[in-house]
Each structure stands twice: as structure tokens, then as C-alpha cells.
Amino acid sequence: GSTKRLALMFVDIVAFTPLSEQLPSYDVMYILNRYFDDMGTIIKKNGGDINNFVGDAFLAAFGIDDKIDSVYRCTQAALEILKDVDVKKEVFLDNYNINFDVRVGIHYGEAIVGMLGNAGNQRLSIIGQSVNIASRVETANKEAETRLLISEDAFKEIEDRAEVEDFVRVKLKGSSQRSTLYEISKLKGQSLVSTDKKIFESGMFWDKIMLSEDLKNGDKKKVNLNEKEILLVRNNNSLSAFSNLCPH
């Protein structure tokens, strides 16, 4: 296993237990499978992965592959999820006479990533306090009467690119101090990393890893890309990249 800084998203269906009791079992499974399939597509498109399902809730992670800007991509996925659920609300109300909605919580922090399980049945798992915090941020939506909240640690990563609808001060479960959580309504600009496979320019394929203006003249910065350490150098306004000390 290894320790990574991840953007973690916890998503839960509002009042699903009483909702599921209204419907035949095959309708419940159909709704859940359709919902999970569409959520997985949105998360994958933004560079994340659903890591675990807990009943009608799920945990998604961004940054396992060491791509940058994980909080922005995670928040973008959350906003797209809410938009998709708004469409599902009408469909499920018309076809099943149920009120369908979700709550989303996002946190950014360190977590342990590794294979867990018995022999022959191991899977990639994420454990640690950050997972618990993401879950508690999601739960705080109920008290705040919101749909999407992100922790202060997550907000710091995107504060100059996020539009805040409101913020709340709450005591998260297990904490004696109040935490500030932010309700995000919109993101500005776009992610610093492309979620497409590659960018084709000047006859070559390139990976977008950061904005060029963020690297000042004379600066150096190490980044991880596809499990390789890349050294970026800006000198006389010319950009160079070094991998294993070999410039390319």
C-alpha cells in the first residue's frame, strides 16, 4: 500500500430506505443499476473511479493515478452528477411516483491506498480518516439543507476557480471543533489536466499537466506523470522537461 493525497467524493441517495419500500425489488434494482452506471460514466469522464459501494451510497476517488487538479475534477463531476440527477428526478417521479435526490460530500486529504481482501478476492481499497471526513461532509448536507458541500481542505485547492453559493459552520461527527464547509454552485475555467487521453499538437501527443504561466522564469517543479517523475524547468522563457535526467 501507499499514502496518497486524494480528492474523495461520498454520494448518498436521500431517504433511500423508505423510498425502496414503496417499490417492487426489481424496480429498486433497476433504478440503482441505472443510477450507478450513469454516475460511473460521469466520474470516469472526469478522471476518477468509484472505489466502493455501501448500499445505495458510493465512494469515488480522484488522484489515485497521481494526475493533478484532483479536487477540481472531483467537484466538476459532483456538479455534473447533480445535473444528471435533476433529469432523473422527473423520470422517476413520472414512472415510479418517487422523489429521488442525492447528497454529495467532498474532502481532500491523505489516505492509504492498497489491495485488501482474502486470498483470491482482493481489490483496491482506500482507508483512513479522509474517507470518514468525506462521509461526514456528505451527512452535513442534511442539517445544512444543501446538496453539495466540500471541506475547507478541498476548497483551498479550488477557491480561485469556484463560485460559492453559501458556507456553513458545523461540528462534524467525531470532532469537537466546528468546520467550515462550502456549497459550490459552479466552477470557473477548466481543469489543469485534460481528461482526454492526449492532446495532439505540432505533430506530437502531449499531456497537459499545468498552466505554463504558473511556472515563472527560473523556476523548477517536479510532477508525477504515469508513475514517472518529471522535472519542469523554465529558463529564459523557454520550457524544458526532464525525465530520469534525460531532457526531451
Task: Annotate each predicted stretch with a short phrase.
Residues 2-76, 124:
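Catalytic NTP-binding/metal-coordinating core of nucleotidyl cyclase/transferase enzymes
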Residues 111, 134, 142-199:
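Cytosolic regulatory/linker segments at or just downstream of nucleotide-handling modules
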